């Protein structure tokens, strides 16, 4: 984790030009609907790439795993995602928005939990159903709680798209690969706002 922080700090300094003012709007504490459980499966720290971080793009509805390689940053893999059904920064509980952050103050994965038996009632007449895939990657999102990256059991058709209550949904198979090959506790996650442009290292992919 210390190595990643050093590398990510260097990346931020290198690509910080043109970011504009930080989002200063007030953020109310919010808890999205996530089943609370005492059953936590420890994450076996195998195949961890501590020089990797995640970028989630609201405009593109994609999750990218990126790696700092020397003075460069490269994309390793990308996955389609489903995000909050409403646009903009999250303001309060139940507003159906996904929070975004800055490169200077990114989110962090605080734990990776076995969510294979988690259920949720979406209020659509289906009742309480399995909804999270095998894993829930909980994010530290200051001002909010209950936000994470998870699967899309019984909602696979929503990916890619905008249909969640604020979390980031992946196809279950993609989530499993992300967990096994890249994700780890302490991993940096940047969620980009709808209007945010591209960093220099991102421009080479377009």
Question: What are these language model-derived features?
Answer:
Residues 33, 39, 72-73:
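Coil residues (strongly favoring Ser/Thr
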Residues 58-104:
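Glycine-rich catalytic cores of cysteine/serine-nucleophile enzymes that process amide/ester linkages
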Residues 38-53, 80-97, 118-125, 152, ...:
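N-terminal post-signal-peptidase region of extra-cytosolic proteins
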Residues 14-16:
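C-terminal motif of bacterial Sec signal peptides marking the signal peptidase cleavage site
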Residues 1-9:
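Sec-dependent signal peptide recognition
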Residues 18-20:
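Bacterial signal peptide processing site
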Residues 43, 100-102, 115-206:
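Exported/periplasmic cell-wall-interacting domains
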């Amino acid at each position: 984790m210390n190595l990643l922080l050093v590398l990510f700090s260097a990346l931020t300094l290198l690509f910080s030009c043109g970011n504009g003012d930080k989002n200063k709007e007030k953020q109310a504490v919010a808890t999205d609907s996530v089943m609370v459980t005492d059953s936590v499966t420890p994450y076996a720290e195998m195949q961890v790439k501590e020089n990797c971080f995640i970028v989630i793009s609201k405009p593109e509805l994609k999750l990218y795993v990126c790696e700092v390689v020397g003075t460069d940053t490269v994309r390793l893999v990308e996955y389609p995602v489903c995000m909050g059904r409403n646009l903009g920064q999250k303001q309060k509980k139940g507003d159906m928005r996904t929070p975004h952050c800055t490169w200077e103050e990114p989110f962090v994965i605080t734990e990776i939990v076995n969510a294979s038996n988690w259920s949720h009632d979406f209020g659509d007449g289906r009742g309480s159903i399995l909804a999270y895939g095998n894993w829930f990657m909980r994010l530290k999102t200051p001002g909010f709680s209950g936000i994470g990256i998870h699967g899309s059991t019984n909602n696979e058709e929503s990916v890619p798209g905008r249909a969640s209550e604020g979390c980031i949904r992946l196809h279950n198979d993609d989530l499993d690969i992300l967990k096994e090959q890249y994700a780890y506790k302490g991993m940096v996650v940047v969620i980009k706002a709808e209007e945010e442009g591209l960093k220099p290292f991102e421009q080479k992919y377009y």
